[in-house]
Amino acid sequence: MDDPECDSTWEDESEEDGEDGQADDTTDEDTGDDDGDAEEARPSLFQSRMTRYRNWRAMQDMQRYRHNYPDLTDQDCNGDMCNLSFYKNEICFQPNGFLIEDILQNWKDNYDLLEENHSYIQWLFPLREPGVNWHAKPLTLKEVEAFKSSKEVRERLVRAYELMLGFYGIQLEDRNTGAVCRAQNFQPRFHNLNSHSHNNLRITRILKSLGELGLEHYQAPLVRFFLEETLVQHKLPSVRQSALDYFLFAVRCRHQRRELVHFAWEHFKPRREFVWGPRDKLRRFRPQTISRPLMGLGQADKDEGPGDPSQEAGTQGRTCGSGRDLSGDSGTAEDLSLLSAKPQDVGTLDGDQRHEAKSPSPKESKKRKLEGNRQEQVPGEPDPQGVSEVEKIALNLEGCALSPTSQEPREAEQPCLVARVANEVRKRRKVEEGAEGDGVASNTQVQASALSPTPSECPESQKDGNGPEDPKSQVGPEDPKSQVGPEDPKSQVGPEDPKSQVGPEDPKGQVEPEDPKGQVGPEDPKGQVGPEDPKGQVGPEDPKSQVGPEDPKSQVEPEDPKSQVEPEDPKSQVEPEDPKSQVGPEDPQSQVGPEQAASKSLGEDPDSDTTGTSMSESEELARIEASVEPPKP
């Protein structure tokens, strides 16, 4: 049995002579401090008496509590458990009280009522010893067991603890560990705590009740908080003495109590006046893992030093873990952004290509290609290709598909284009010969199909809109401006077809009515596609795109009687009044739109023989004319 007059905190570490901590403290001379206290002058007799002073009444009271009131026996209360009934919300506290739920819900922010009413605290935090309120019954051992076994009662006890912490400007951060910290309104609440010293008695009661009702782990964090605020932060000077005399020794766990006493000894100034523990044992004592958790979250000790290595490692691990998580997200976010940016870039490229394919002017697309090639060159290096070569490449590329879907090499597309042209011509011949009963119309359609541009996706043919404006989209012995889009087979110029005239908007596309023979011979400068005619060339730099006068097949011989237009034939005359003989902007079929598939001329294919094709078609037309020519009037 411990001596009730002594402090049992250090009793198991007493020396062989049996002296306890208090005796060591009494006989200790202030010459062995390692922290600079030895350099101070020895205190006088009066100072020694003051430094050796300790509140013995407080020490005895707290030791009696820690030893579960050995001199106290439960009174026979006839089976009544008033404290348990109050916490079950069955009765009101006395005198003139309320139910516990009313207090927990309505008194939370009513600080004046919590300060002025002195009857509720004995009911909220009952003890085994009687208090000043004789209406409040002392706590019995049966009630203690009932408090610990009832979840409802335990929950209300924690809420009552949070209510009083808020009244003192403190916040419970973790219900599991009991860690506490300053509340947002701690300054006015600390001021009230300094002004009303009776709250020190309330805090002592709260600490004792927590130890009685199964919440012992809530004691040490709260005591550590008050030691921090009084000895380190110096915010609660009125609470300092009570914290050292009562709060420290309300902790029932001996090891935690030693940790707290050592913490108080380290921060007490002057240290030689510290009387709440034996100095020699405090010098030898080494804090363990309890120091850092006692403060609660966010209440790091500025003067303590390293503190708890395990908790620091845990905190660092959490920080590193969060840092790794953040870096992984950012990396994932970057990967996702890159993955999401790739299809956007592809879509942008496709959009640029579609915009370029639909550009109204082919010269602008050439200019953009040329500028793009120049920008790709390193500054200071000579241009490996001349301007003429770049223009040739641009012209050759115009003959190929520039749509977003055709990204294969252009050389592989040339045989496919020729094959598609031949198939298209054969299909048109079959359809037109079967559908049209008129020989003249059939003759005209055959010639139109033979002279129509090859189906291609060239942006030039899609951009020109009308034949006469683009001299490079047609190649043939006839006037390139005399052709209209492939959708209107009747708009072609034929020797026997009176509908082959170009409207008055194109003066060069008309057959002069003054020419009775209607022949297109070498004397007619417009019937030839020579070097003097800049509109008969595909490109000025492409030698394969010209049909020169040296080619005898490029002219229609005047000796061929079938190629002449008889003056007696009324169909060979130019009737300007005939609405069908004009191709104007009013005729929707006379325009070449970007939606026409067959918009490329055979002359743009350097591998195809344009002149030979035109001559063979002329002979075929002559044979068809001889067989189906109607009698002349």
Curated annotation (Swiss-Prot):
Sequence repeat locations: 467-475, 476-484, 485-493, 494-502, 503-511, 512-520, 521-529, 530-538, 539-547, 548-556, 557-565, 566-574, 575-583, 584-592
GO MF assignments: opioid growth factor receptor activity
Keyword Acetylation in annotation: yes
Acidic residues: compositionally biased ranges: 1-38
Pfam families per the UniProt record, alphabetical: OGFr_N
Domain of life: Eukaryota
Region annotation (Disordered) ranges: 1-44, 287-390, 404-633
The UniProt record lists the keyword Phosphoprotein: yes
Biased segments, Basic and acidic residues type: 351-374, 505-517, 550-580
Region (14 X approximate tandem repeats): 467-592
InterPro entries, alphabetized: OGF_rcpt, OGFr
Family, per entry: Belongs to the opioid growth factor receptor family.
Job of this protein: Receptor for opioid growth factor (OGF), also known as Met-enkephalin. Seems to be involved in growth regulation.
The protein, known as: Opioid growth factor receptor
Gene: Ogfr
